[in-house]
Amino acid sequence: MSVDLATVKRVAKLARIALPEDEAERVMGELNGILGFVEQLSEVNVDGVEPMTSVMPMAMRKRKDAVTDGGKADDIVANAPETDRHFFLVPKVVE
């Protein structure tokens, strides 16, 4: 697969990137190089290879889910001019 100049210009327009004509030629070459590398990767035989998310085998530490108020209610309303039981009080706007 390769991209032509029209495709490069269309992608630049969709991405809202100003792309001068001389830059479009260079970008076309770079994109074709990237696509060539991706095609090489698709030729690699990965039969029997386990999918992985990291090169280092790691297990996430899990904690028990617990619902809390975060312990920050006093800090959150500390600078509010008026509060009532950790709720902000604001002037009535709609009649």
Curated annotation (Swiss-Prot):
GO biological process: glutaminyl-tRNAGln biosynthesis via transamidation; regulation of translational fidelity; translation
Keyword presence, Metal-binding: no
Top-level taxon of the source organism: Bacteria
Cystine bridges: none
Gene Ontology MF term list: asparaginyl-tRNA synthase (glutamine-hydrolyzing) activity; ATP binding; glutaminyl-tRNA synthase (glutamine-hydrolyzing) activity
Keyword Calcium: no
EC number: 6.3.5.-
Reaction equation(s) it catalyzes: L-glutamyl-tRNA(Gln) + L-glutamine + ATP + H2O = L-glutaminyl-tRNA(Gln) + L-glutamate + ADP + phosphate + H(+); L-aspartyl-tRNA(Asn) + L-glutamine + ATP + H2O = L-asparaginyl-tRNA(Asn) + L-glutamate + ADP + phosphate + 2 H(+)
Keywords: ATP-binding, Ligase, Nucleotide-binding, Protein biosynthesis
One Pfam family here: GatC
Stated family: Belongs to the GatC family.
Quaternary structure annotation from Swiss-Prot or TrEMBL: Heterotrimer of A, B and C subunits.
Function: Allows the formation of correctly charged Asn-tRNA(Asn) or Gln-tRNA(Gln) through the transamidation of misacylated Asp-tRNA(Asn) or Glu-tRNA(Gln) in organisms which lack either or both of asparaginyl-tRNA or glutaminyl-tRNA synthetases. The reaction takes place in the presence of glutamine and ATP through an activated phospho-Asp-tRNA(Asn) or phospho-Glu-tRNA(Gln).
HAMAP family, A to Z: GatC
Protein known as: Aspartyl/glutamyl-tRNA(Asn/Gln) amidotransferase subunit C
Organism, scientific name: Allorhizobium ampelinum (strain ATCC BAA-846 / DSM 112012 / S4)
Organism lineage: Bacteria, Pseudomonadati, Pseudomonadota, Alphaproteobacteria, Hyphomicrobiales
